[in-house]
């Protein structure tokens, strides 16, 4: 099956799995998804990520995180820049999510990073997603 927006597919899988209280979710691997997963682990939204081979394809196994084993830590994920409508932000225009309670994932010339890291490095780029 051909997926037109693999990043949106990954975010939707994580959102659906966390709402269904699953302990882990499997997504097809790519370099971009690996970087997004790394950011989610670093920022404390998911517990861990492992890369595995499943037949001929690489997969990422994301271990989800819950508050007191009940409420998911990830309360929301939103894809911003889409294949049909790309959204870019200058270094001064990178948005803040929920007044700083969430994160922005930005694709810059130096790689994929959070909005705070992009502001600190004075880099703009494509706004991939909001996570809160």
Model regions and ranges:
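Core subunits and conserved enzymes of cellular information-processing
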Residues: 1-132
């Amino acid at each position: 099956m051909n997926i037109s927006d693999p990043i949106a597919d990954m975010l939707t899988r994580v959102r659906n799995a966390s709402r269904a209280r699953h302990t882990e979710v499997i997504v097809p691997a790519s370099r971009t998804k690996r970087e997004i997963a790394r950011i989610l682990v670093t920022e404390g939204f998911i517990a861990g990520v492992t890369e595995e081979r499943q037949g001929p394809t690489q997969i990422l196994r994301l271990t989800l995180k819950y508050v007191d084993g009940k409420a998911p830590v990830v309360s929301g994920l939103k894809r911003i820049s889409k294949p049909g409508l790309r959204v870019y932000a200058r270094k001064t225009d990178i948005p803040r999510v929920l007044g700083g309670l969430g994160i922005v994932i930005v694709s810059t010339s130096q790689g994929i990073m959070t909005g705070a890291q992009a502001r600190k490095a004075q880099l703009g780029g494509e706004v991939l997603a909001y996570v809160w």
